[in-house]
């Protein structure tokens, strides 16, 4: 199991921590979308952050979608994770590379820009719930921390990191989500905050072989306890049947136009790049069904 997420708790059971190694799933996304460095960093951090939220909040058949609606060159990022810890996502502009910051790191803040962060939860109720906050940083981890504080009133700390190699492949990807539970003292929170500040640069640490278990001990201490360890993966659940269902929602005139003028249709999944081709006959069958023939 290369990519996995762990859930841990401190000895006094008033801090909950999720840590993740997601190098392979971010690499899969990079390969599917052919993203360049800045686009990879934005997409990778969004994938990791959404998985951490899903791991903390979802159960059953629930799912969660993060939308990062920034005005930077990468444009919007859309990521959906399910309770089984599968994730899929895309950015609006795949081919964005920016000059490095003075410290040599990718300028994610500039790539994202200003705008809004939305989190939509489909908890199996009648209507999905959406929380929205302004993008306060653009680094994504800080924006998720702000979202959790403002929209969900949960004192949290989020760290996310993606290392992109010079050839645009993914060298490392990981992160954490720390949440205070009822009863956590100010002294404990300050002590834990100091530990987080003392952490090595996350991407370098993951490159050097740090595991989610190692990261948990660095944040919570050696006496912390691991509660769960679950595999995480990039997985798109698109299918030709789903796209046929989408075509059925179009107006009859639109389907007729596809048949008469385009002589078929090719639909491309934003999340994974899979292409689905529909022949004239298949489109005609969808139109006939729609018209009740």
UniProtKB/Swiss-Prot annotation:
Q: Is this entry keyworded Nucleotidyltransferase?
A: no
One GO CC term on file:
cytoplasm
Q: Which GO terms describe its biological process?
A: protein refolding
Q: Where in the cell is it found?
A: Cytoplasm
- Read off the SUPFAM superfamilies from this record: Hsp33 domain (SSF64397), HSP33 redox switch-like (SSF118352)
Query: Which keywords does the record carry?
Result: Chaperone, Cytoplasm, Disulfide bond, Redox-active center, Zinc
Molecular function terms, GO-annotated = protein folding chaperone; unfolded protein binding
Q: Which InterPro entries match?
A: Heat_shock_Hsp33, Heat_shock_Hsp33_C, Heat_shock_Hsp33_N
Query: Which Cys-Cys disulfides exist here?
Result: 236-238, 269-272
Q: Give a Pfam family name.
A: HSP33
Q: How is it modified after translation?
A: Under oxidizing conditions two disulfide bonds are formed involving the reactive cysteines. Under reducing conditions zinc is bound to the reactive cysteines and the protein is inactive.
Answer whether the UniProt record assigns the keyword Chaperone to this protein. yes
Q: What NCBIfam families does the annotation carry?
A: PRK00114.1 (NF001033)
- Tell me its family: Belongs to the HSP33 family.
Q: What does this protein do?
A: Redox regulated molecular chaperone. Protects both thermally unfolding and oxidatively damaged proteins from irreversible aggregation. Plays an important role in the bacterial defense system toward oxidative stress.
Write down what this protein is called: 33 kDa chaperonin
Source species of the chain: Lactobacillus delbrueckii subsp. bulgaricus (strain ATCC BAA-365 / Lb-18)
List the top taxonomic levels of the source.
Answer: Bacteria, Bacillati, Bacillota, Bacilli, Lactobacillales
Q: Which gene encodes it?
A: hslO
């Amino acid at each position: 199991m290369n990519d996995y997420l762990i859930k841990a708790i401190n000895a006094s059971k008033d801090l909950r921590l999720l840590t993740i190694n997601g190098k392979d799933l971010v690499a899969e996304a990079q390969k599917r979308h052919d993203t360049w460095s800045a686009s990879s960093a934005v997409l990778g951090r969004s994938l990791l952050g959404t998985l951490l939220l899903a791991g903390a909040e979802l159960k059953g058949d629930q799912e969660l979608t993060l939308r990062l609606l920034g005005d930077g060159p990468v444009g919007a990022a859309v990521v959906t994770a399910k309770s089984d810890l599968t994730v899929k996502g895309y950015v609006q502009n795949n081919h964005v590379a920016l000059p490095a910051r003075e410290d040599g790191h990718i300028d994610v803040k500039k790539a994202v820009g200003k705008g809004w962060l939305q989190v939509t939860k489909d908890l199996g109720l009648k209507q999905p719930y959406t929380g929205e906050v302004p993008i306060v940083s653009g680094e994504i981890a800080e924006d998720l921390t702000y979202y959790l504080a403002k929209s969900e009133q949960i004192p949290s700390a989020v760290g996310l990191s993606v290392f992109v190699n010079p050839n645009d492949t993914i060298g490392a990807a990981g992160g954490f989500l720390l949440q205070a539970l009822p009863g956590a003292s100010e002294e404990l929170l300050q002590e834990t905050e100091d530990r987080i500040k003392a952490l090595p640069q996350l991407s370098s640490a993951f490159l050097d072989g740090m595991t989610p278990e190692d990261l948990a001990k660095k944040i919570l201490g050696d006496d912390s306890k691991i509660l769960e360890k679950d595999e995480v993966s990039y997985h798109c659940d698109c299918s030709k049947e789903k796209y046929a269902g989408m075509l059925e929602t179009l107006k009859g005139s639109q389907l007729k136009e596809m048949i008469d003028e385009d002589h078929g249709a090719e639909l491309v999944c934003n999340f994974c790049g899979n292409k689905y081709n529909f022949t004239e006959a298949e489109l005609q069958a969808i139109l006939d069904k729609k018209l009740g023939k």
